[in-house]
UniProtKB/Swiss-Prot annotation:
One of its GO terms (molecular function) is magnesium ion binding. Signal peptide: none annotated. HAMAP family: RuvC. The gene is ruvC. Mn(2+) is a poor substitute for Mg(2+). Binds 2 Mg(2+) ion per subunit. Binds 2 Mg(2+) ion per subunit. Mn(2+) is a poor substitute for Mg(2+). It comes from the Bacteria. Probably part of a ruvC-ruvA-ruvB operon. Does not seem to belong to the SOS regulon, no LexA binding site has been identified in the promoter region. This is Crossover junction endodeoxyribonuclease RuvC. Changing residue 67 to Q: Does not cleave HJ DNA. The active site is at residues 8, 67, 139, 142. Changing residue 12 to A: Does not cleave HJ DNA. Its EC number is 3.1.21.10. PROSITE patterns: RUVC. Optimum pH is 8.0 to 9.0.
Length: 174
């Protein structure tokens, strides 16, 4: 039984989702959004760090799965997103968690079956897979999807003997 923490990083809103991986599939544990407010960036990053560390200490996951940065139209936004990712990753590393990174299309492919799914499709599949009766906030549902992606990826690698096969820099390299 493994607990996986998924993080959808952001400098203003960071979604988190915790799932328990069992022999019967994945079960919902917790989810929510970390709202950092409107202060200076360094204060918001500190909120992300402290809050992710608190989620880890509360729920005790052994793995963190996080979305990779994508380069959009706005380089400043991508830099802030990367810094928020860094704050979450450092919190996880300080608590001894393994870290796995996934692209948005990998997450969508693993959860919905197509890398081009929209946020509502991801949200509906997360609800279905985790048997949720209410829609989680969109950032929280993205984080749950990232955790589910990690669980599905690990399950598909086990039969091939690839889990932990080659790790460099904290990422599984295939």
């Amino acid at each position: 039984m493994t607990l996986i923490l998924g993080i959808d990083p952001g400098s203003r809103i960071t979604g988190f989702g915790v799932v328990r991986e069992t022999a019967r599939g994945c079960e919902y544990v917790a989810s929510g959004c970390i709202r950092t407010g409107n202060g200076p960036l360094h204060e918001r990053l500190h909120v992300v760090f402290r809050s992710v560390r608190e989620v880890i200490r509360t729920h005790g996951p052994t793995a963190l799965s996080i979305e990779q940065v994508f380069m959009a139209r706005n380089a400043d936004s991508a830099l802030k997103l990367g810094q928020a990712r860094g704050a979450a990753i450092v919190a996880a590393m300080e608590e001894g968690l393994s870290v796995a990174e996934y692209t948005a299309s990998q997450v969508k492919q693993a959860v919905v079956g197509t890398g081009g799914a929209d946020k509502q499709q991801v949200q509906m599949m997360v609800m279905h897979l985790l048997k949720l009766t209410q829609k989680p906030q969109i950032d929280a549902s993205d984080a749950l999807a990232i955790a589910l992606c990690h669980a599905h990826t690990q399950q598909s690698l086990v039969p091939h003997g690839l889990v932990g096969a080659r790790r460099r820099g904290g990422r599984l390299r295939l």
